[in-house]
């Protein structure tokens, strides 16, 4: 088999948001616990909640809700979660920060001619608020979220980015912190990079066969530069 070829046009980096670009672990964990408490249920705790981050909200909640919680109960939990998240987000002390080096990485990729997309389990409202609050609109050429189509790990959001930006799978990389991100990228036949500073562990990302797992923004940048030069992240 011949070695992979570098992209013939601008490469495309597709980023997850929560746990990849922004450290939202604390606020998401607290919001999920508050949602369960509002329904009189035992809070799941962060170690359970982290396993379902990235999925569309109702699908995620259904996975961790106690047996006996029906579809209406899941919908109520989702509404409680949204309300708790909005309330917590209004507290300046609860603002989820960009990870160190994330802004600089986006600036570097843009300067090198990359196109940048987003594939996130956030709602459209949540994604728009994130982009506005962090002043990131100048970086993203396309962005798709849970409101636009099927949940991760379905390939939809990656394929939508590809179609919107007229890119082929071999010209794109999916970057994310969960197995759902990696499987979504694999289902769309694009290269995948796992980052181990978010919700899923390095071992979990290796188990789902990410092309490479990185631990720092500089390692992520190096993998993306390799992709632009050689068509592979390793």
Which residue ranges define each predicted feature?
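Glycine-rich phosphate-binding loop signature in dinucleotide/nucleotide-binding domains
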Residues: 6-8, 111-114, 165-171, 227-231
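N-terminal helical cap/lid subdomain that shapes the substrate entry/recognition surface
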Residues: 6-17, 21-104, 110-112
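Substrate-recognition element of Asp-dependent hydrolases with the DxDx(T/V) motif
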Residues: 32, 102-131
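Hydrophobic patch in the ABC ATPase nucleotide-binding domain
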Residues: 41, 136, 210
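Substrate-recognition "cap/lid" segment bordering the active-site pocket of phosphatases
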Residues: 95-97, 117, 123-174, 179-188, ...
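Nucleotide-sugar donor-binding loop of glycosyltransferases
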Residues: 196
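Short acidic-hydrophobic, aromatic-tinged amphipathic segments that line or gate anion-handling sites
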Residues: 212-216
């Amino acid at each position: 088999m011949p070695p992979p070829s570098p992209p013939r046009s601008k490469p495309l980096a597709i980023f997850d948001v929560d746990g990849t670009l922004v450290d939202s672990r604390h606020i998401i964990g607290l919001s999920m616990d508050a949602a369960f408490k509002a329904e009189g249920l035992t809070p799941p705790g962060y170690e359970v909640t982290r396993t379902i981050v990235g999925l569309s909200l109702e699908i995620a909640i259904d996975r961790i809700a106690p047996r006996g919680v029906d579809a209406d109960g899941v919908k109520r939990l989702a509404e409680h979660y949204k309300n708790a998240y909005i309330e917590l987000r209004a507290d300046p002390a609860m603002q989820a920060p960009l990870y160190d080096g994330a802004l600089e990485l986006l600036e570097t990729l843009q300067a090198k001619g990359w196109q940048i997309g987003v594939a996130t389990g956030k709602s459209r409202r949540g994604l728009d608020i994130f982009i506005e609050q962090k002043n990131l609109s100048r970086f993203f050429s396309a962005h798709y979220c849970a409101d636009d189509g099927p949940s991760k790990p379905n390939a939809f959001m990656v394929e939508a980015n590809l179609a919107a930006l007229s890119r082929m799978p071999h010209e794109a990389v999916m970057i994310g912190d969960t197995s759902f991100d990696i499987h979504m990228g694999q289902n769309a036949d694009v290269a995948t990079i796992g980052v181990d500073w978010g919700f899923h562990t390095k071992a979990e990302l290796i188990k789902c066969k990410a092309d490479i797992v990185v631990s720092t923004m500089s390692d992520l940048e190096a993998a993306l530069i390799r992709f632009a030069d050689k068509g592979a992240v390793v």
